Amino acid sequence: MAAALLVIAWDASAAGPLLVADTFTATTANMTPAGVNLRMQIIQWQDAAARTEVVATLAADPDASTLAKLPTVGYVWPNGSPVGYSVKYANHAPEPDGKERVTLVTDKHLGSYDFKGWSAATAGGSDKPYSVIELELNSSGTGTGTFSLGAEVLLDEAAGTVALKPGGQTLLTNVKRAAGQADKGSRP
């Protein structure tokens, strides 16, 4: 029995701490609740095959319980909340003008843990059981963003990508990449 406990403790310590590939912060705006600070931690940027698997799952069965079974590649943490949202899709796409687009999909819609759910100032968003978050960053790592509460979700199964329909409300302001993470080589 003591040997079994020793092996379990050894395995747990061998895993070590989870390393974070990238961290972004943002503040909710033009919605209820406004002013909520979010921290988005990416443990691992996904390759094309992993992203395609998530998109196929979303296209076949957009039920959150099915999405929850996919590997977790990050978390979205609302400020002051002990509960975060699991990120199941994480894509980083540099754009020709030096900007970058970050797209994340969580297995539950943002605000689902709150007593009163989150709502956008104007209609036009998605009622999916998950959230799609898009961040638009300039070359200095700052910008704005939105998520599926304020924009329609677009799935491209052939390309294995998720996006939000252009022109959606800006629901995330003060978007920033955490200091010291702008030049990480961990992005596919």
What role is predicted for each listed range?
Residues 15-98, 105-110:
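N-terminal secretory signal peptides
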Residues 74, 83-188:
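Mature extracytoplasmic/lumenal regions of exported proteins
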Residues 1-8:
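Bacterial N-terminal signal peptides
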